[in-house]
């Protein structure tokens, strides 16, 4: 097999592992989201790293998603406006959760593949101290493969997988890249975006399915690029003004 074929094989293997081993976690997470949506709460979603943020973006303001999703996108976290040290800044997460209105009784979906940086760990700790519940999308294998003294780690040497109330494991190996090329020192082609996107969309699908089975009408977002889509969105979004920070 060439490198592209080996990459495809490795990625599909990870996806199969997620769907085989994470059904219980997905089920419990979906039930928790339904509970909070019944209480008319928004679901806070925070990707706490330069690429993990894409998992939160996948759930936010996108056709097929839910309207009451409060995407958390603070300055300095995405690869377009970040400094490598921003996600390692102790104390930043508390101010972020203040700004985005994470409160007692809420649920925070935290997405970070390595699960070790300061913003990730502080966000989990701070949310729980406020009385919120935390769903973590992360790789236990990656977290446990990072030595305690690695500079990227939170000073407390903690892992997201040990703090979250529900952990959905994305099963990404340490280092993220998965293809060996003869003669090249480092592996190439990162894997993590695929299982993270699979997890968040599977969680959305399961949540909506169960709501419908319970006779509830989930507020699913249609495409703004189809006739009437934008007009419908503007109407529904009024319900969440002030609670979904980045509505447009």
Residue ranges, per PLM feature:
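Generic N-terminal amphipathic, Lys/Arg-enriched alpha-helix
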Residues: 1-20
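Flexible, glycine/charged-enriched surface loops at secondary-structure junctions
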Residues: 21, 25-28, 43-45, 212-221
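A short, well-structured juxtamembrane/interface segment
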Residues: 21-38, 96
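Long amphipathic N-terminal alpha/beta scaffold segment
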Residues: 34-40, 49-53
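Glycine-rich phosphate-binding loops that contact phosphosugars or nucleotide phosphates
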Residues: 45-204
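Internal, active-site/partner-interface "lid" segment
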Residues: 149, 176-180, 184-187, 209-234
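Acidic, Ser/Thr-rich low-complexity intrinsically disordered segments
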Residues: 227-248
């Amino acid at each position: 097999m060439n490198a592209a074929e080996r990459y495809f094989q490795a990625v599909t293997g990870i996806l199969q592992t997620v769907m085989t081993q994470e059904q219980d976690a997905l089920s419990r997470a979906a039930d928790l989201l339904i509970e909070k949506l019944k209480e008319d709460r928004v679901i806070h979603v925070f990707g706490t790293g330069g690429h993990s943020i894409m998992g939160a973006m996948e759930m936010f303001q996108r056709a097929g998603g839910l309207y009451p999703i409060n995407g958390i996108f603070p300055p300095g976290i995405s690869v377009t406006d970040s400094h490598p040290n921003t996600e390692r800044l102790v104390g930043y997460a508390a101010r972020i959760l203040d700004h985005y209105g994470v409160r007692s009784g809420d649920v925070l979906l935290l997405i970070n593949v390595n699960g070790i940086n300061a913003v990730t760990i502080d966000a989990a700790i701070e949310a729980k101290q406020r009385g919120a519940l935390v769903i973590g999308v992360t790789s236990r294998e990656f977290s446990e493969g990072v030595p305690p003294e690695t500079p990227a780690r939170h000073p407390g040497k903690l892992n997201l997988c040990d703090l979250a109330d529900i952990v959905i494991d994305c099963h990404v190996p340490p280092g993220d890249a998965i293809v060996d090329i003869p003669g090249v020192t480092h592996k190439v082609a990162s894997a993590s975006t695929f299982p993270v996107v699979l997890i968040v969309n599977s969680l959305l699908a399961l949540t909506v399915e169960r709501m419908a089975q319970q006779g509830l009408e989930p507020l699913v977002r249609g495409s703004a690029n189809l006739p009437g889509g934008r007009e419908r969105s503007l109407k529904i979004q009024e319900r969440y003004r002030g609670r979904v920070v980045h509505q447009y």
